[in-house]
């Protein structure tokens, strides 16, 4: 991705004593999240890492306004969330592109849904495509793109409305190792040019430490925040930083939490 000064207004996120319960078809109650507290400052990149089933995606759905809390409060810029927030964009693990629409049409879909002036957003869509290295691909269809390229389009779609908050739910989980490595570098580059607030869900400790300003470690279900780790590493971060003793120590700190919980074993 090329550096691109796309103007964004970042937001704060305040999560207070949030709990989420589900009821199974058999009537059994499952506590997915338990008394979760998180404060995210405007422009911060937060990575949330934890084992499968710990409530990471549930947390993201609550912040996105796609589900309601069972208890507690979530606010964006001080405004309590009761539905999908207009300042929020979401990127899922699957790109969810519509195969019958071109790349440009997929990016502009949120604009059409909100009945805004499509033509006014075409230049921004093209600017985003150039920022993610897909200049000239606007007329292509999803089937003509690789998995990494489709995920770049999904990121453009999330950014087209200039969201102050970008929520990413394991966006690189379905990609091969080499593509994932490139996407991690590309995301860092784009975020440094945009500087909006990001909450990034991942299973990968390495990925979390490399990308984030802070890494939040969640316990096995019911999910709680076991560790809030500030990552004090210079930016932009290069791949060679994986060999930095400080980077390795951050990774070991997170691993020790999982080992203590029985998630990882020596």
Question: Which residue stretches match the model-derived regions?
Answer:
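A short, flexible loop at the N-terminus of ABC-type nucleotide-binding domains that lies
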Residues: 8-12, 21-35
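The feature captures the beta-strand-to-loop junction immediately N-terminal to the Walker
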Residues: 49-51
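Helix-to-loop junction immediately C-terminal to a conserved catalytic motif
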Residues: 64
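Conserved ABC transporter NBD signature motif
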Residues: 72-84
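Short coil-to-helix segment of the ABC ATPase nucleotide-binding domain corresponding to the Q-loop/switch region
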Residues: 101-108
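Conserved ABC ATPase "signature" region
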Residues: 112, 119-137, 189
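Conserved signature/switch motifs of ABC ATPase nucleotide-binding domains
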Residues: 140-143, 161
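Catalytic Walker B motif of ABC-type/P-loop ATPase nucleotide-binding domains
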Residues: 166-169
